[in-house]
Curated annotation (Swiss-Prot):
Residues 1-22 form the signal peptide. It is found in: Secreted. Pfam families: Antimicrobial_2, FSAP_sig_propep. Transmembrane segments: none annotated. Its main location: secreted. This is Lividin-2. Antimicrobial peptide. InterPro entries: Antimicrobial_frog_2, Frog_antimicrobial_propeptide. Residues 23-41 form a propeptide. The lineage of its organism: Eukaryota, Metazoa, Chordata, Craniata, Vertebrata. It comes from the Eukaryota.
Length: 76
């Protein structure tokens, strides 16, 4: 259970750093003129897909943790 918490925390931390870098890049692009290129559209789509996958993994992890907790404490 501790290992799962550490890995979820690591995913959250890496996602936060990635989001921060993307926001900095967007701000720099806005200062340059605000034109959206095809590469930026792809990057935005992949970033959204990645965030969706991370949130799904977090939800699944929480579900597994609650089930394991229930079974270990024999309160199910």
């Amino acid at each position: 259970m501790f290992t799962l918490k550490k890995s979820l925390l690591l995913l959250f931390f890496l996602g936060t750093i990635s989001l921060s870098l993307c926001q900095e890049e967007r701000n720099a692009d806005e200062e340059d003129g605000g034109e959206v290129t095809e590469e930026e559209v792809k990057r935005s789509f992949l970033d959204t897909l990645k965030n969706l996958a991370i949130s799904a993994a977090k939800g699944a992890g929480q579900s597994v943790l609650s089930t394991l907790s229930c079974k270990l404490s024999k309160t199910c």
